[in-house]
From Swiss-Prot:
Annotated disulfide bonds: none
Higher taxonomy: Bacteria, Pseudomonadati, Pseudomonadota, Gammaproteobacteria, Thiotrichales
Co-factor: note: Binds 2 Zn(2+) ions per monomer.
Assigned keywords, A-Z: Chaperone, Cytoplasm, DNA replication, Metal-binding, Repeat, Stress response, Zinc, Zinc-finger
Name by which UniProt lists this protein: Chaperone protein DnaJ
First and last residues of every CXXCXGXG motif repeat: 143-150, 159-166, 181-188, 195-202
Compartments (UniProt record): Cytoplasm
Major location (coarse): cytoplasm
Protein function: Participates actively in the response to hyperosmotic and heat shock by preventing the aggregation of stress-denatured proteins and by disaggregating proteins, also in an autonomous, DnaK-independent fashion. Unfolded proteins bind initially to DnaJ; upon interaction with the DnaJ-bound protein, DnaK hydrolyzes its bound ATP, resulting in the formation of a stable complex. GrpE releases ADP from DnaK; ATP binding to DnaK triggers the release of the substrate protein, thus completing the reaction cycle.
InterPro entries for the chain: DnaJ, DnaJ_C, DnaJ_domain, DnaJ_domain_CS, HSP40/DnaJ_pept-bd, HSP_DnaJ_Cys-rich_dom, HSP_DnaJ_Cys-rich_dom_sf, J_dom_sf
ZnF (CR-type) residues: 130-207
Notes concerning its domains: The J domain is necessary and sufficient to stimulate DnaK ATPase activity. Zinc center 1 plays an important role in the autonomous, DnaK-independent chaperone activity of DnaJ. Zinc center 2 is essential for interaction with DnaK and for DnaJ activity.
Gene designation: dnaJ
The organism of origin for this protein: Francisella philomiragia subsp. philomiragia (strain ATCC 25017 / CCUG 19701 / FSC 153 / O#319-036)
Assigned protein family: Belongs to the DnaJ family.
Length: 374
C-alpha cells in the first residue's frame, strides 16, 4: 500500500514554512485527537497520520531527507513516536509549550556551553607550511571543589516552586503557557550551602592551554572550529566550541591574492638591457629566473606552482614577479661620462630605434597639442 504524502496529510504546500506546518498540525490534531473522538477508529488512524507527518516535517533534517528521497529517506528513523499510544488531550499543547508538571518528568534544563572565539596571528610562512600553536584561553569549567554541583556538600534539593521541573506552567482555558522558574532559574533545584569557590554556580573561570594545529594553506579570515573546547555546559549538556580566527601578517616581500603570490622584482639597468639570471626568493627556497634582454619595467614573470598551497588538495598557486628597472644613483664622474658617451652613441633617432614606447608617447603628446591649439 502506497504511503500518503506528508504534505497532503497536513494540507500544506511543499514550500510551507515551519510556522505554517505547526499551525496546520495544531488545527488537525485538535480535530482528530482520540480524547475528542472516543471509539472512533478512523479518527485514531487519522491522528496517527497527522502526528507522523508533523514529526517529519517539523524537523529540518528529516524534512530534507523526505523531500529528497521520499518515505525511504525517513522510514529508518522509526516513524512518529505517537503511533505506540496516546497521552491526554494536553499532549497537543506540550508540543508547542513544553511538557506540563503533571507528567512528573524532570524539567531541569540542560544548557549547552557558550562558544568562544580566539584570534591567532601567524606569518605568511606559517600559513604556507602549517604550524602548531599553543594558546591560553580563559573559559568556564566545572568547579572542582563541588564537582559542578554548586554546593559545598555536593548535593542539591528540589526547587519548591517548580517541583524540579525548571518551569512554571499556567493554564488559561484551552491554552497552557510556560515560563522559566524565577526561583531556580530553570535548574529545577536549589542549593542550601553554596560553594565558596563558584558561589553556587557550579562553574569557575580557568585558564586552559590548548594546542591548535593550523593546516597549510590557511588564509586571512579563515576559522578553525575546535569542538567541545568552549565553555562547560550545564546539567550534563555539551561544552561549547572554540573558534580560532586566523590573522595572517603582512609580508615584506609577497602579497597574497587567493592562492597566488605577487612581488616586485628590482633589476639593474644593465641586466634589463643585456639580460641574465637573477635569484628570486620564494616561500620554499630560491629559484633562478632568466631575464630576457631588453626587459622593460612592468613586465611580469610567472613562476608556476611557486605560490601558496591549497587548503584542500595538493594544488599550488603561482608566483608573479613584476619587474622594476632601477635607475643607477650616486654615479661618479667617470660613470656619468660613460653614460653620456652611451647616449651620444644612440644617435638622434634613438627613440624610434631604442625607445619605442617613449617615441609613441611623445608622438601622442604632439598630436594632442596640435588638436588643442588649432
Amino acid at each position: 500500500m502506497q504511503q500518503k504524502c506528508y504534505y497532503e496529510i497536513l494540507n500544506v504546500s511543499k514550500t510551507a514554512s515551519g510556522v505554517e506546518i505547526k499551525r496546520a498540525y495544531r488545527k488537525l490534531a485538535m480535530k482528530y485527537h482520540p480524547d475528542r473522538n472516543p471509539d472512533d477508529k478512523e479518527a485514531e488512524i487519522k491522528f496517527k497520520e497527522i502526528s507522523e507527518a508533523y514529526e517529519i516535517l517539523s524537523d529540518d533534517g528529516k524534512r530534507s531527507r523526505y523531500d529528497q528521497f521520499g518515505h525511504a529517506g525517513v522510514n529508518q528513523q522509526g516513524g512518529a513516536g505517537s503511533a505506540g499510544g496516546f497521552g491526554g488531550f494536553e499532549d497537543i499543547f506540550d508540543t508547542f509549550f513544553g511538557g506540563g508538571t503533571s507528567r512528573g518528568s524532570n524539567r531541569s534544563r540542560a544548557s549547552r556551553g557558550s562558544d568562544l572565539e580566539y584570534t591567532i596571528e601567524i606569518s605568511l610562512e606559517e600559513a604556507f607550511f602549517g604550524v602548531e600553536k599553543e594558546i591560553n584561553i580563559p573559559r568556564m569549567e566545572s568547579c572542582d571543589s563541588c564537582d559542578g554541583t554548586g554546593s559545598k556538600s555536593k548535593t542539591k534539593t528540589t526547587c519548591h516552586a517548580c517541583h524540579g521541573q525548571g518551569t512554571i506552567r499556567r493554564q488559561q482555558g484551552f491554552f497552557a503557557f510556560e515560563q522559566t522558574c524565577p526561583v531556580c532559574n530553570g535548574t529545577g533545584s536549589s542549593i542550601a550551602d553554596p560553594c565558596d569557590d563558584c558561589y553556587g554556580s557550579g562553574k569557575i573561570k580557568k585558564q586552559k592551554t590548548i594546542k591548535v594545529k593550523i593546516p597549510e594553506g590557511v588564509d586571512n579570515g579563515d576559522r578553525i572550529r575546535l569542538q567541545g573546547e568552549g565553555d562547560s555546559g550545564s546539567n550534563g549538556a555539551m561544552n561549547g566550541d572554540l573558534y580560532i580566527q586566523i590573522l595572517v601578517k603582512e609580508h615584506k616581500i609577497f602579497e597574497r591574492r587567493d592562492m597566488n603570490l605577487y612581488c616586485e622584482m628590482p633589476i639593474s639597468f644593465t641586466k634589463a638591457c643585456l639580460g641574465g639570471e637573477i635569484k628570486v626568493p620564494t616561500l620554499d627556497g630560491e629559484v633562478v629566473l632568466k631575464v630576457v634582454p631588453e626587459t622593460q619595467t612592468g613586465k611580469v614573470f610567472r613562476l608556476r606552482e611557486r605560490g601558496m598551497k591549497s587548503l584542500r588538495g595538493q594544488r599550488r598557486g603561482d608566483l608573479l614577479c613584476k619587474v622594476v628597472v632601477e635607475t643607477p644613483i650616486n654615479l661618479n664622474s667617470e660613470q656619468k661620462e660613460l653614460l653620456e658617451k652611451f647616449a651620444d652613441s644612440l644617435g638622434e633617432d634613438y627613440q624610434s630605434k631604442h625607445s619605442p614606447k617613449s617615441k609613441t608617447w611623445f608622438d601622442n603628446v604632439k598630436d594632442y597639442a596640435k588638436k588643442f591649439f588649432e
